[in-house]
Curated annotation (Swiss-Prot):
HAMAP family per record: TorD
Keywords: Chaperone, Cytoplasm
Biological process according to GO: protein complex oligomerization; protein folding
Lineage of origin: Bacteria, Pseudomonadati, Pseudomonadota, Gammaproteobacteria, Alteromonadales
Functional description taken from the UniProt entry: Involved in the biogenesis of TorA. Acts on TorA before the insertion of the molybdenum cofactor and, as a result, probably favors a conformation of the apoenzyme that is competent for acquiring the cofactor.
GO cellular component assignments: cytoplasm
Record protein name field: Chaperone protein TorD
Keyword Cytoplasm: yes
Localization in the cell: Cytoplasm
Gene name for this UniProt entry: torD
Length: 209
């Protein structure tokens, strides 16, 4: 497999993870995530020991949805975790975990920084996704873009500074609210993927630095 193919595969994983944080799973998305091609993808991903438990939980949840009621329950989980700002939720915004303020505000420093990154890459948050730019879904989608359009050093710096710097805190909050749930598994898989990607990028960057 060429480096281009590897980077494309990495981008697909980041794009998938981004999509799961961006919106609830609807009927069309469920069909995509449980298709034959998707099953092969999940199977391949689960071969990595650090991903197995999370992938198995994700697959079993998706494959277990057989009616509208179960799909609505998963949508309710998404809404309760990510759209309602209470102590029983886990807001997916970097500023809430990186700011030193007692009550950090949305659209703050991390949002401005991420907006500038997007601007430099001639990208923008889509109008149908009215969220701050430091939303995890935006960051993961941007990383998917970097995989195919930027040097390894740029990718590594973004992952370490903008994603890995707060992801564990977010997941800790999420698992407290949603222990052993679908979105806890998605978040845990995201952290494991980011950690592995950093570990693979570091040697490559060290060689050329």
């Amino acid at each position: 497999m060429s480096q281009v193919d590897i980077n494309h595969a990495r981008a697909l994983v980041y794009q998938l993870l981004s999509s799961l944080f961006a919106r609830e799973v609807d009927e069309q998305r469920l069909k995509e995530l449980t298709s034959e091609a998707a099953q092969q993808f999940w199977e391949q991903l689960s071969l990595e020991a650090n991903f197995t438990q999370s992938v198995d939980k994700i697959r079993s949840t998706l494959n277990g949805i057989k009616d509208d009621e179960a799909l609505l329950e998963l949508a309710a989980d998404y809404c309760g975790l990510f759209l309602v700002g209470t102590k029983h939720s886990a807001s997916p915004y970097a500023s809430l975990y990186l700011s030193g303020e007692d009550e950090p505000l949305l659209f703050g420093e991390q949002h401005q920084q991420m907006s500038e990154f997007l601007h430099q890459s001639k990208l923008q948050v889509q109008s149908h996704f009215p969220e701050p730019a430091d939303h995890l879904a935006v960051m993961l989608a941007y990383m998917a873009h970097l995989c195919c359009h930027s040097e390894d050093s740029v990718q590594l710096s973004f992952l370490q500074t903008c994603v890995d710097s707060w992801l564990a805190k977010f997941i800790n909050q999420l698992t407290q609210c949603h222990k052993n749930g679908f979105y806890s598994a998605v978040a845990t898989l995201t952290l494991a993927w980011v950690k592995q990607d950093i570990a693979q990028l570091e040697p490559a960057v060290a060689v050329i630095s």
